[in-house]
Amino acid sequence: MTADSLRERLKSQNADYSLLNTSQASNRSAFEDKMSPVCKSRYVNDNQRLEQSRITMLETRIKWHIILLTGFSIDHLVLNSSFTSAILLFGFFPSYVNSSISLFVIIYSLIMIASYAFEIKFPNALKQLVYNKVQSKPPRPESSKSTPIVPDAQNVLDTSVQSNDLSWVDAHRFGTPSFKSSQLQQSPSPNKKSPSYSQVMSNVSVSDTSGILEDTKGGWKSPAVYGKSNESIHTRKQLDVLLRSNQDEIPVDMNTSTFSSIWSVFGLGRSGQISANNTWQVSEEITNDGNTNSSYRMKIGKNGRTEVKMLRRGKDGEIEEEDEDELVRLHKILNAAKLTPEGKTGILKRSNSIDRAGIRSRRRSHSSPERSTSTENEIRYQTGELLTEDQQKRAEFMTRAWIRNTILEPLAEHIDKVNKILDKEHANPPLRVGVSSVDALKLAAIERDSLKSSDLPFLLPFLSVHPNQKYLISRIKELCATQFMDAYKWNSGGSEPTDDNDQMTRLVRREWNDSLPTDAVLVFDIFLAYMDAQLNSNCLVGDSRLDQPFTSRFCVKNAQKPSSAQRTPFSFYLHMVTKSPPHAEFVHIDENGYAIKCNVLRQSPNLFRAIAQFIHFVKHENHGYLDQTSIGPSGINMTYVLA
């Protein structure tokens, strides 16, 4: 069955067409709204299965009590309680005691059969009756004056254009935790008291990670206290995209609608936590129609910084459009003066040496160590170094162990678990992760109720990183075979498993070729898919990448350019400069808007050292948080890679 036929089949069933997008941006299946048709049907099916199991259990109890009733009735009426006498110490008690006991068992069986039948016919009727009795209270006297219900001013913000109070704009900061600075210290999870990383690694060498293997696995299991928060600000268009799955079925208040994540796979435990404040808040977009008589105009420049310009008006009062700022216009005038022959213009010709000296002085203003303080850490930040060479070597091995224990090994285990479920389905044509295409698996996850409640919908973002499913699954299992991914090859990969045409039972392997991803690119894409699952969607990511909150904000690939948000001061991201040969960098923007690239060794250690630099910067310069998700033990648990 081809991909086109699968798409037509899905389209004919009025399903969400975005689930068949096989590009790397298609990770929506792991972030479905709990009110979407897919998740609603999943919950309905779960409730039906629970109800069916409850009825089956009650019917089994009724059958056993009927058998008990029949046996003791025959013993009491026909055998004169001889069977009861044999059970009770072989006739030790008198006959009237045996007769009373058999009669008691008969009455007990009748009562239990009646109660079970009533429970099947009217489930939870007695509990509801008792609950209503407890909750019933005498009516309160009506007050003489009715007071209108005023919503809490702390939860409702007036973001309209007519509002004069704009303090909420200054109070809100995108990408920072929504709590006080006194709470920035990372606290361990209330469910698990884990020792600090320094205590665990004090007596452990680089080659021995037995003390951290169990702790690093907590990244999939420990619920993040501030992770996957459901509170953010979105534009109206983005909110429509997020809630498009249930707009036609349930009336939704667009200003206070809920959107809860259901990322509960791999034992994250997030489904049990209910956020008290999980509302979306719609923000007003900036327009230039507010005051036409204003002499100033606010504009976001190419470097991402906000610029305020004075408007120039002509003789008739119309505004003269000038997209260039004063500095760009000055550079154009100077360049024109350089190209103009001497003696034909009144503009002085500026020498190249003066121009270059000015450029060098501007560069020294943000990167020269002479302006920094005497501390070694600040000097390293301004020269583009976050970790020393010894720290990078240790962090490289720790990052290898963290990725293997936290992402690759659980991923391989749950792929085998889903394959066992698919084998029991006996589908025609047969489905299997690693053999079937991603489109076929997505269609099966939508059509079959048994797969909706499985781990398959949450595996789809990881399976979408490359179309060759056989090589992808085989390479994941090969990489997670050892603690430090000894099979990792930065500029190549493993052999490709293929079926031999002559002998169908024989599995042969072809050497790695350019059509397959390198291990560096493969591990990087899987790392991005995992991080996308940990963060919430954000209003800065745009309308088409709401399902990639981490990739769209903290990653730049070779064919892309940094977005305006990534070029703003104090932002940071991972940059995959080239794919062949693969080379990654960590880049952070200083207070002047200049990009500082950290020195990362090339070849095999490159990817892991770049990720370690990223984690180090988040921990020390961003309070240990990515957006509202902690990277410490209470969240994603990434800080273990730092010694």
Curated annotation (Swiss-Prot):
Residues covered by region (Disordered): 179-200, 349-377
Protein name per its UniProtKB record: Uncharacterized protein B0464.6
Coiled coil spans: none
Biased composition (Low complexity): 179-199
GO annotations of cellular component type: membrane
